[in-house]
């Protein structure tokens, strides 16, 4: 998709995004009011709304504010927010659809906000269940992303070679940037080294469009340089390995030609990773990569 098409799509989706935020807030108000009449006051709604909007607009503020460390903080918050928002919408919309189409809900006949004050207390239970579900799934998602999984897949290639076989570690989509940490990179390196592989291949998207998003890049490169294998570590570029401004996953037209930040290449050299750019290499006179 071209940059102009991304821009048009972003402009089209912006009001839809705002409507979704209003929809979520209305249900949050309804649930709070069902919990206690005291929560119907502005003393509750104003701070809750301000806090919610802080998260809701964090993709935009993180995009516009470039001064560190606030920029980095907002980008981290916005990334977590966008991931959590998917589950918020999924569960609330599912709950609302079931409420409207089944005739068996205790509060089926109620419509927010016109009948807000007549909503029964059962909304406390159902709303609490939905909120708990959102929190559990979101927390699981964060913890799941921090784990390193190893999957072993035997692959047979019908070609002659002087080698009886190769044990290759294939990793991809490191997305080194706002939400990556040195400890996580270290965990990946330690996991690779524990497998005693012959070759390490990195299948693109080492970076996340912004070299400056990496905290302490020299240290991260040092950690990656600790990868151990018989024939070395090789990589190829991915679509995120270019310098490009992104807002909530959308790229925007730029006056200058999009180029790859030279620091990406320097980083890989520092990390001992060989980048293959539309090329093959003969390794140890035994096989081609």
Q: What would you call each of these model-derived segments?
A:
Residues 1-146:
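Non-catalytic terminal accessory segments
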Residues 151, 156-289:
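Soluble catalytic domains of enzymes that build or remodel membrane lipids, polysaccharides, and related
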């Amino acid at each position: 998709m071209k940059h102009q098409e991304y821009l048009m799509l972003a402009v089209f989706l912006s009001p839809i995004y705002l409507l979704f935020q209003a929809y979520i807030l209305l249900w949050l108000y309804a649930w709070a009011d069902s919990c206690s009449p005291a929560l119907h006051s502005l003393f509750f709604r104003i701070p809750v709304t301000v806090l919610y909007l802080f998260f809701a607009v964090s993709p935009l503020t993180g995009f516009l504010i470039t001064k560190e460390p606030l920029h980095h903080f907002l980008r981290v918050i916005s990334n977590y927010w966008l991931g959590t928002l998917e589950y918020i919408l999924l569960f609330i919309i599912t709950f609302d659809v079931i409420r409207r189409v089944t005739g068996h809900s205790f509060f089926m006949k109620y419509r927010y906000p016109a009948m807000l004050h007549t909503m029964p207390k059962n909304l406390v239970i159902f709303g609490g269940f939905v909120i708990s579900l959102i929190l559990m799934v979101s927390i699981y998602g964060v913890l799941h992303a921090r784990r390193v999984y190893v999957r072993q897949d035997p692959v047979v290639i019908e070609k002659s070679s002087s080698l009886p076989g190769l044990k290759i570690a294939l990793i991809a989509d490191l997305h080194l940037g706002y939400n990556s940490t040195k400890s996580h990179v270290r965990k990946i390196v330690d996991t690779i080294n524990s497998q005693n592989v012959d070759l390490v291949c990195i299948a693109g998207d080492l970076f996340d469009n912004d070299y400056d998003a990496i905290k302490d890049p020299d240290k991260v490169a040092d950690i990656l340089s600790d990868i151990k294998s018989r024939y070395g570590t090789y990589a190829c570029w991915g679509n995120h390995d270019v310098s490009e401004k992104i807002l909530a996953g959308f790229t925007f037209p730029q006056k200058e030609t999009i180029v790859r930040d030279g620091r990406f290449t320097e980083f890989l050299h520092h990390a001992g990773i060989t980048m293959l750019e539309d090329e093959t290499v003969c390794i140890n006179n035994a096989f081609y990569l």
